[in-house]
Amino acid sequence: MDSSSTKSKISHSRKTNKKSNKKHESNGKQQQQQDVDGGGGCLRSSWICKNASCRANVPKEDSFCKRCSCCVCHNFDENKDPSLWLVCEPEKSDDVEFCGLSCHIECAFREVKVGVIALGNLMKLDGCFCCYSCGKVSQILGCWKKQLVAAKEARRRDGLCYRIDLGYRLLNGTSRFSELHEIVRAAKSMLEDEVGPLDGPTARTDRGIVSRLPVAANVQELCTSAIKKAGELSANAGRDLVPAACRFHFEDIAPKQVTLRLIELPSAVEYDVKGYKLWYFKKGEMPEDDLFVDCSRTERRMVISDLEPCTEYTFRVVSYTEAGIFGHSNAMCFTKSVEILKPVDGKEKRTIDLVGNAQPSDREEKSSISSRFQIGQLGKYVQLAEAQEEGLLEAFYNVDTEKICEPPEEELPPRRPHGFDLNVVSVPDLNEEFTPPDSSGGEDNGVPLNSLAEADGGDHDDNCDDAVSNGRRKNNNDCLVISDGSGDDTGFDFLMTRKRKAISDSNDSENHECDSSSIDDTLEKCVKVIRWLEREGHIKTTFRVRFLTWFSMSSTAQEQSVVSTFVQTLEDDPGSLAGQLVDAFTDVVSTKRPNNGVMTSH
């Protein structure tokens, strides 16, 4: 009976422990569920501190936990040693002007916020700690005593050396506590004779026993005398402390301007503060004493301009009375960065055409054209160039104007996006097999000359029927080519008289340059180079098809510029050019990017 009862107790104990462990492991999940349930299904605007020994609820707008993390580096110590931290705390029982934040001593040294601090010619803090967050000045004599107590009780040499060195740095250059500093200086000299410089790698990594040092007893005696002497001075150490001057509230932060308001503290009324002086300077610099902003107690809102974007500035405020300087506070602020890429303003100025329709301005039209190559617009540019070649530019614009002046239809059918017809002679097929100009065999821009001659000399009625069925229309003996409008981005149909002349010399066709814009030259050159790379075996047909489709349909202005740069720079080295294009654009051309900018993969 005794053994069975013992087993049952052990089993019950194990079950209880498992339940307890599960309860502790699910604390985070339960906290999240409580956050959801407590808000009626809405998440609370807070997050839980990652420190296992803290687990405090931190407001969402805070970047670090103010309860356990350093206000300078925003990190926490898992095994926190309070003697290695500085805290902004009240010096008196009735002191309410403090923020309560803490920081590592080493972080305070790095930011020059502890020890003997010279704030220009304005103020000099001797043996004090200036809070990194609010600027409140506190004494460090208590922290200095903690270092000597830890040094006296240290059992390892590295710990002893570090604590003595820390106590020496805290009061280095002091005039108020020179007697205490001389005691630590003597202990430091003794240790350096044995282990070398206290801030060197030898002393910091020496894990030897302290009792085996010949000077260990003398160093411990010096620590004891220094601690006793500090206790006598601590009662009068707070007489020269500087209280906080004010609180800062940044109302607006811009790239080159900051608007802030100084919040007055209760001590300002008690001690009859007359006004405030403000210095602002870049982090790491020192302010000039005569360059400050003076403001009274009634006008505490200031706008600071002529700042540099994306720069951290320090704002230092000193309150003054009739007797002189009274309080000191400081705060840091990062100015915002400047947006290089600005969104297109939909309310940009537009020009008005002949019939009163709003047309995009020249700047907007150029930006729209350069953003991507539209196949429909490409066909329009090609026909415009052909009209210039044949001297029919005036007829082209006359027909276009007549088309615009026609009364609009009551309801236009919905336009099919990218529903262009590659059979229309005005729209070239970018993926069609490329034929060099020297082997064109009597064709001009991919259009057989004999077919045009037959169209001019054939039967009028039959040819008109065939032309209309193929998306073209003929009038009299001249073939008037009209696009069906499905591929034109601007949605207009145009007529153009085409009169082809047989060209005996095939090299002349290559000399006809398109003067419409540099965009067409870039596209034409890139297409020729890509086809040339395919014929030479440097790229595959699949990559060529996808690349040209992407380049003409979806590429942005920046991507087009990159491709053009690659082509112009590496044109003499086809292997390097092909490798660069494949490496840079394989993922891009394999991704479908609709016109609305949403990325959808295959």
From Swiss-Prot:
It comes from the Eukaryota. A zinc finger (PHD-type) spans 67-137. Residues 502-602 are annotated as: VIN3-Interacting Domain (VID). A motif (Nuclear localization signal) lies at residues 144-151. GO terms for cellular component: chromatin silencing complex; nuclear speck; nucleus. The keyword Repressor applies. Residues 9-22 have a biased composition (Basic residues). Keywords: Flowering, Metal-binding, Nucleus, Repressor, Transcription, Transcription regulation, Zinc, Zinc-finger. Pfam families: fn3, PHD_Oberon, VIN3_C. Involved in both the vernalization and photoperiod pathways by regulating expression of the related floral repressors FLOWERING LOCUS C (FLC) and FLOWERING LOCUS M (FLM). Together with VIN3, required during vernalization for the modifications of FLC and FLM chromatin that are associated with an epigenetically silenced state (e.g. chromatin modifications, histone deacetylation, and trimethylated H3 'Lys-4' H3K4me3 and 'Lys-27' H3K27me3) and with acquisition of competence to flower. Promotes flowering in short days (SD=8 hours light/16 hours dark). This is VIN3-like protein 1. It comes from Arabidopsis thaliana.
